[in-house]
């Protein structure tokens, strides 16, 4: 079922999606702070590897207790570059740790989320990576501009 098919399910489905997204954002902020602290006891790449290893253990545990689908099915994905998500994740972990250490959690997360928003919208506009292409909407452009202005205001002393 595609993204647009799921949207038609109604308000409850969207509300659950909103709730999950809010939890995700909160967990990402907490994880970034935790990872930055772990780095202080070791090194950034050791901390990043530990983070990825613990994520692997949790994912295997969740797989064992839930769906038990064939793990080799993941290799059927096309195009194959989609399998680079884990490698990208390693660099995400690294850049989150570095930015939180250098800027502090609030500034770093604000910039990270704004960058995510802008890149995600560009992906939708251009239909990259198999995402359904969306038309330009002024209100979304203005929303991104407001986010950027928010960064300037937040940083302003």
Which residues does each PLM region occupy?
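C-terminal transmembrane-helix exit sites in multi-pass transporters
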Residues: 118-138
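Hydrophobic/aromatic residues within transmembrane alpha-helices
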Residues: 47, 99, 126-128
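Structural motif at transmembrane-helix junctions in multi-pass transporters
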Residues: 40-44, 95-114
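Membrane-interface interhelical linkers
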Residues: 2-23, 40, 56-81, 132-138, ...
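Glycine-/small-residue-enriched transmembrane alpha-helix faces in small-molecule transporters
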Residues: 6-41, 45, 91, 95, ...
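Hydrophobic/small/kink-forming positions within alpha-helical transmembrane segments
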Residues: 29, 60, 90, 114-122
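Hydrophobic transmembrane alpha-helices of multi-pass small-molecule transport proteins
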Residues: 136-155
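Small-residue-rich packing faces within the transmembrane alpha-helices of Major Facilitator Superfamily
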Residues: 56-57, 118, 148
């Amino acid at each position: 079922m595609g993204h647009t098919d799921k949207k038609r399910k109604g308000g409850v489905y969207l509300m659950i999606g909103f709730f999950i997204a809010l939890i995700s954002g909160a967990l990402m902020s907490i994880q970034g702070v935790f990872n930055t602290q772990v780095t202080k006891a070791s090194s950034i790449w050791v901390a990043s590897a530990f983070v990825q290893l613990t994520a692997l253990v949790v994912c295997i545990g969740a797989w064992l207790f839930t769906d038990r689908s064939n793990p080799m099915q993941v290799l059927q994905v096309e195009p194959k570059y989609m399998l680079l998500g884990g490698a990208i994740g390693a660099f995400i972990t690294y850049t989150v740790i570095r930015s939180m250490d250098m800027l502090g959690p609030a500034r770093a997360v604000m910039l990270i989320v704004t960058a995510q928003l802008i890149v995600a919208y560009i992906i939708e506009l251009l239909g990259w990576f198999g995402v359904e292409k969306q038309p330009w909407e002024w209100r979304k452009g203005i929303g991104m501009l407001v986010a950027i202005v928010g960064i300037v205001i937040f940083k302003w002393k």
